[in-house]
From Swiss-Prot:
Pathway: Cofactor biosynthesis; 7,8-dihydroneopterin triphosphate biosynthesis; 7,8-dihydroneopterin triphosphate from GTP: step 1/1
Keyword flag Repeat: no
Homology family: Belongs to the GTP cyclohydrolase I family.
Designated name of the protein: GTP cyclohydrolase 1
Pfam families linked: GTP_cyclohydroI
Any one GO biological process: tetrahydrobiopterin biosynthetic process
Residues involved in Zn(2+) binding: 75, 78, 146
SUPFAM superfamilies named in the record: Tetrahydrobiopterin biosynthesis enzymes-like (SSF55620)
Known catalytic reactions: GTP + H2O = 7,8-dihydroneopterin 3'-triphosphate + formate + H(+)
Highest rank taxon of the organism: Bacteria
EC number: 3.5.4.16
GO cellular component: cytoplasm
Gene Ontology molecular function terms on file: GTP binding; GTP cyclohydrolase I activity; zinc ion binding
């Protein structure tokens, strides 16, 4: 599989008018393979294994928010990067998940070919199903290189998506608290 991938990169270089055998490009097919292997490593990771090993009994029934989780992903339409921050909250239902597992969950789905809308939904659904939370809220703010580098070429534009499940969707006060915590946190830095 690696050789086939590297041959495709060589062919692409030739098609755009480059010499894949020149000094600066000779190892490029291998570098590109390793890069894409890493950037798409989320396909080989199991969400249940990541989350189920870190569920702990708890009487906490208040919102848990992990904000400003930096991520990068690849747009499935152009294979160009998009990157930003995810804010993920849930309300426990007798169990809490280890805090480091929430950024790991974001990484699992971000390291796949994606669109932001789907990424947001997948994170929310995986947390809801695997943690049995009373509710989940996810907001992602991201910049897309397919928007900034090509097409409309609008630098620094940000796309915001949200996915709400359970009590976050049904209860206005919970939803307002979630959005308020995300927005107020933007002014506080340690």
């Amino acid at each position: 599989m690696q050789k086939k991938f590297e041959d495709c990169v060589k062919t692409m270089l030739e098609i755009i008018g480059e010499n894949p055998n020149r000094e600066g490009l000779i190892k490029t097919p291998n570098r590109v393979f390793k890069t894409y292997e890493f950037l798409t490593s989320g396909y080989t990771q199991n969400v249940k294994e990541i989350l189920n090993d870190a569920l702990f009994e708890s009487s906490n029934n208040e919102m848990v928010l992990v904000r400003d989780i930096e991520f990068y992903s690849l747009c499935e339409h152009h294979l160009l990067p998009f990157f930003g921050r995810a804010h993920v909250a849930y309300i426990p239902n007798k169990k809490v998940v280890g805090l480091s597992k929430i950024p790991r969950l974001v990484e699992v789905f971000a390291r796949r070919l994606q669109i932001q809308e789907q990424l947001t939904e997948q994170i929310a659904q995986a947390l809801m199903e695997n943690v049995d939370a009373k509710g989940v809220g996810v907001v992602i703010e991201a910049r897309h290189m397919c928007v900034e580098m090509r097409g409309v070429q609008k630098a620094n534009s940000t796309t915001t998506t949200s996915a709400l499940r359970g009590i976050f969707l049904k209860n206005e006060k919970t939803r307002e608290e979630f959005f308020s915590l995300i927005n107020s946190a933007k002014q506080v830095r340690f």
